[in-house]
Regions:
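Amphipathic coiled-coil/heptad-repeat helices and related helical stalk/stem segments
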Residues: 1-2, 66, 144
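Metallo-beta-lactamase
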Residues: 21-107
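C-terminal regulatory/interaction regions
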Residues: 112-174
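Short beta-strand element of the conserved SAM-dependent methyltransferase core
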Residues: 18, 32-34, 168-171
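Residue-level signal for the nucleotide or nucleotide-sugar donor/cofactor binding architecture
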Residues: 5, 61, 139
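Single conserved hydrophobic/aromatic residue that forms the stacking wall/gate
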Residues: 1-18
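Conserved acidic
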Residues: 2, 6, 95, 136
Length: 174
């Protein structure tokens, strides 16, 4: 049957046996997804949500791990995702690819900001999230920090002074 049959089955049984766990660090360092292999269904928790990308907030969240975990999910054969937040995801591979592309676009926005002379995360957030309500800027800053940490790991950006949200960043010479 399709995923609606799975939903009805879970509602009627109220419990199920899951034998396959998938370690997906990134959103948090210990995040796990759980699979029902026979149904090709994956319970994605907060790693892949149905309505938005997950926040990745250092130090427990790590963007490099998050992206690696998304790539891992692309290698799986799941036909439906059941996230903790949002509707079920009927086209998981397309959804995951869109999340990866979104994170790559955010990294490019950071590089664009630095090229325009914006070197601090607090100043990048309004430029990058101009369509986001201001009360969400602190969460957005945590996400920018995670992307910045990933750019530093990849040696595309260097820390000039300070650290974290208070740091000043520039493009790497290499």
């Amino acid at each position: 049957g399709d995923h609606r049959d799975l939903h009805l089955s879970i509602r009627r049984q109220r419990q199920m046996c899951i034998r396959d766990s998938v370690y997906t660090p990134g959103h948090t360092s210990n995040h796990m997804c759980f699979a029902l292999q026979e149904q090709k269904a994956l319970f994605t928790g907060d790693h892949v949500m149905g309505w938005s990308t997950s926040i990745v907030s250092p130090p427990d969240g790590d963007m490099s791990d998050y992206l690696d975990s998304l790539e891992l999910l692309l290698q799986r054969d799941d036909q439906v995702y059941w996230p903790t937040h949002g509707p079920c995801i009927d086209e998981p591979k397309a959804h995951v690819r869109a999340f990866i592309q979104h994170r790559q676009e955010r990294e490019q926005q950071i590089i664009d900001c630095i090229e325009q002379g914006i070197f601090k995360i607090g100043e990048m957030v309004p430029a990058m999230y101009h369509d986001t309500p201001e009360f969400m800027y602190p969460a957005a800053a945590r996400s920018v920090l995670a992307a910045m940490d990933n750019l530093v790991k990849k040696n595309r950006v260097i820390v000039v002074s300070g650290s974290g949200l208070e740091g000043e960043y520039q493009l790497s010479a290499s």
